[in-house]
Amino acid sequence: MTRSLKKNPFVANHLLNKIDKLNT
């Protein structure tokens, strides 16, 4: 999973934004 995130920073950023909205 970490490898694919490194290859796709856009996807990782999208997931981080999703988590951020859930935490808010």
Curated annotation (Swiss-Prot):
This is Small ribosomal subunit protein uS19c. GO terms for cellular component: chloroplast; ribonucleoprotein complex; ribosome. GO terms for molecular function: rRNA binding. Protein S19 forms a complex with S13 that binds strongly to the 16S ribosomal RNA. The keyword Ribonucleoprotein applies. It is found in: Plastid, Chloroplast. Keywords: Chloroplast, Plastid, Ribonucleoprotein, Ribosomal protein, RNA-binding, rRNA-binding. Belongs to the universal ribosomal protein uS19 family. It comes from the Eukaryota.
